[in-house]
Structure formats: C-alpha cells, structure tokens
Amino acid sequence: MVLNEKDMELLKFKENDVVVKRVKLSTGEFYAKYCNIYEAFMELLGNKVFALSGIKCPTYHYIKEAYCVISDDVRKYDTYYHPFDLNMNGYTLRNVKGKLCDSGLFSNMDEINFQIDVMHFIDILFSNIDRHISNFGFARREDGTGYLVVYDNADFLTQFDKATRPMSIDGADSLSFVFTAKEVEAREFISKLSEEEILYLLKIYEMFSPIRLVTIIRSIEKENNIKLPDKLDVFKKYLKNYLMVGKLLKERGKIHKK
C-alpha cells in the first residue's frame, strides 16, 4: 500500500484521538487503530484467523511509521461488521464488548462458543501462556440478542459460559485450556470429556494444526514486514505439548466411535 505525506499525517494519532478512527486517505476510506508492534502483531494474527475461520472482514495492514494497523478500503465491501464492530481488537482481547448476535454474524450458540474457544486458544498459545482460562463470556438479553463480553478479570466471567454451555469438567469456562495442559493433567481432563466435547476440541485442533499456525505467523511477517521471532519461540516451546494433546484427543475420539 502506497501512502503519501498527507495520508501519513492523517494516520498519526493525536493525544485526544480515540483508539480507533475512520480516515479518508488518498487511496480510499479506512479504519485505523493505534498500536505498538506487539499489539499490531496480535491484531494481524486475529484478522488472519478470522478470515481463515470463514468470517468475511477487511484485511489489516501494519503501518509501522504511524504506529497503527489499518483496514482495507471499506468502500469496496457491501456489508461488513466484523471485526470493526469489535473496535479492531482482534486478539488483543482487552476491553472488548462486541456485538456478535446483533450483527447477525452467528445464528446459534454453538457457533458463538466455537469462535470464543478459537479466540481463547490462539490467545493463550501466542499471547500470554499463563493467562487465566476464564477470559470469555456470553450474556443474553431478554429479547434474545446478546453480547460477547471479554474482560481480564476472570472471576467476573464465571457465570457466563456455565450458563450457556455446560462443561463436563467442573470450573471450566472454556475447553481450549486443555491445549496447554501438561500430559498428566491433559489425560485426566480428556478422560472426563463427553464425545461432543472431544469432537469440538478436535475441530479446533484440525483447524489450527501446528504447520498451519507456523504458516500463519510467517505469512503475517512477510505481508507486513513485521518480525517478532519470540512468537515462534513461544510456539516451539509448546509445540511438543500441543502435539501430545492432539494425539490424546484423537485416541479418545476413536474410543468414542467404537
């Protein structure tokens, strides 16, 4: 993307600017979000994963000189409501109150919960391995519409997932934490899971195989001229564990099929 001096000036965030702003550049109309290089990577990762998950959304671009991530020209989209309705938070997962049901993006709770677990899985694998498992919640209103709510205060969310999607494991707000469990814990957790939950986790595992995850990271680095080698280091550190959990899930899945 070629930007001129005037474009760069418009992209610069001033002290009183909101975190996300709409800007008219020489090449089109865009959304821009202020972020440092680490936050930018997580935005780009989130955007890429959304696209791979089949969610239609404008592609992000990292503008290093302006400390921001910008969208594609939004005028070329007839309708778009994601992830900009989430204020371009991608997978930084901070202070997000995204209108998912209201947008009509998902038609049922299972799909919403699947997306929540995918978000959680990517976040704990690449962002903060020690993050508490209770980061996501879904609240319904009386009229049937609802909001996905994300907070860092884990205790606040305990009520949400249990109310919308009962788990076989007591205290589990999201199944995706299984992917970071050590072998003894993983075996214990997985032995308690129902067939539905096993298939659910296998769906996530197959969507984001180790090779595919590395490919995603490298494509982000190449497309945006952004290099964060620690992301691959973190992934390699947990790769053996991730493969082990995948193997356990597949073994358990075969038992259920018999």
Regions found by a protein language model. Give the residues of each.
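Conserved ATP-binding subdomain of kinase catalytic cores across diverse folds
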Residues: 1-90
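C-terminal catalytic region of ATP-dependent kinase domains
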Residues: 35-36, 139, 143-258
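Short alpha-helical "patches" and their helix-cap loops
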Residues: 59-65, 132-141, 255-258
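ATP-dependent phospho-/nucleotidyl transfer catalytic cores
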Residues: 69-121, 142, 183, 192
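Conserved kinase catalytic-core segment
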Residues: 97-162
